[in-house]
């Protein structure tokens, strides 16, 4: 296959994957697709994870070397977390299930490192969201090029648990209550 054919294929596949990313989020938000979703007091808490929602088929795969922005706005990769287990959560401010699970991710971050990596397009959007919601433990990571979502062919929210050596333990798609007993047991699988 020639280099131009490969380049054409990549140019065609990226928009399709991005469309799948947006379509995969059951955003439950009306109005502007890019409008920030907000959790409400009457909104149900994300469901506890179910064993059948946990995908272990990639167990042992190394973390990708895809670059994204750290909380300081500087480029980084998942390798920065090597040496400790980390729960990577791909989310966006316009994704209803993502927004619902953020408070429980913040609570879970008391026991495990959580990298909530926004798939939004700009830092001011997520900085404003974090300031408005007053998270105690989560930090605003940003993947404005959605490179991780493309790598994982992700529907939002997607969570991937990595062990301390940087290898995948499991992944899950859909919102969860990260404070549930089942979620705590799943997170304890990373060493």
Language-model features, listed with the residues they occupy:
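N-terminal targeting signals for export/organelle localization
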Residues: 1-65, 181-184, 191
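A short beta-strand-turn-helix
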Residues: 55-61, 65-86
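Structural microenvironment flanking redox-active thiols in thiol-disulfide oxidoreductases
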Residues: 99-133, 144-150
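Thiol/disulfide oxidoreductase modules built on the thioredoxin-like
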Residues: 131-137, 142-190
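Hydrophobic beta-strand anchors of alpha/beta hydrolase catalytic cores
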Residues: 87-88, 114, 159
């Amino acid at each position: 296959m020639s280099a131009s054919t490969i380049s054409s294929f990549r140019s065609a596949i990226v928009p399709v994957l991005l469309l799948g990313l947006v379509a995969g989020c059951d955003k439950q938000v009306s109005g502007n697709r890019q409008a920030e979703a907000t959790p409400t007091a009457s909104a149900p808490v994300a469901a506890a994870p179910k064993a059948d929602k946990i995908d272990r088929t990639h167990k042992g795969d190394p973390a990708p070397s895809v670059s994204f922005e750290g909380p300081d706005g500087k480029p980084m990769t998942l390798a920065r977390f090597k040496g400790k287990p980390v729960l990577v959560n791909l989310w966006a401010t316009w994704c209803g299930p993502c927004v619902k699970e953020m408070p429980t991710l913040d609570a879970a971050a008391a026991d495990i490192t959580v990298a909530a990596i926004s798939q939004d397009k700009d830092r001011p959007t997520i900085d404003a969201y974090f300031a408005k919601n007053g998270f105690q433990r989560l930090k605003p990571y940003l993947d404005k090029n959605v490179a991780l979502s493309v790598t994982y062919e992700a529907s939002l929210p997607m969570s991937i648990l990595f062990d301390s050596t940087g290898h995948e333990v499991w992944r899950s798609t859909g919102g969860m209550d990260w404070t549930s007993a089942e979620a705590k047991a799943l997170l304890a699988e990373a060493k």
